[in-house]
Amino acid sequence: IDFRSKSIQEGRYDPDVDEILTNQWSRIIVHLPYAFQGKRMFPDVFRHDRRNLPMWEKITEEIGPEPLPEDFLDTPEGIEQFEKANDSYRRLISKTEEFKEFVFQRIEKTQRASSLIGNQYTGSIFLALMSAVESDYLDGTEMESNRIGLCGYGSGAKAKVFEGIVQPSWREIASRFHLFERLSTRHAINKTVYEALHKGKRKKSVVKPNSEFALVEIGGEGKLEGQRRYEWVE
């Protein structure tokens, strides 16, 4: 909402003339603690952006009108009933062909790498971006000058929404990722090795670094306690 307001103030977006922002974005990159978080959280955004558009009439004809807070008693029980009804409606939205197509066009490529890796925490939004960019590169999709939306958020219920424009050099950069190729050559480890790595007991790398940054030390004391130091290893 804040991004939309700022876009209007700065002349970037005119809601009376321009297509809604989530349709302007060719790809929507979000923080993915698990692969399908993006598509599971987006029914609310999808509804918010479209409930006043003609296309929303077709959806309400299919799944019915959305539940509104004023239709329920202003009591703890009434609030709980509304939340349950809203959750059910969110699931109905996610099953419509319109929403499925939205996810396929704008979100699906962003979740491919995450589905092979898992939670990258603060790195997951960058992984989603790499996943989409490399997928478009491999598919031969023309993305130059397209806008992409990005959304980073945390457990404190705060989020930052911003957008980017794909630059002419994107193909040359994407060609150097080799993201999915590298993922296909990973080395599996067992539970014992994983726990030793997690607890910092294992000092030797499972796989010898090869032309990449490698963790060489976890420091020290005071403000530097837990600091992770990396070096480039040929």
Stretch-by-stretch model annotation:
Residues I1-E234:
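Terminal domain-initiation and capping elements
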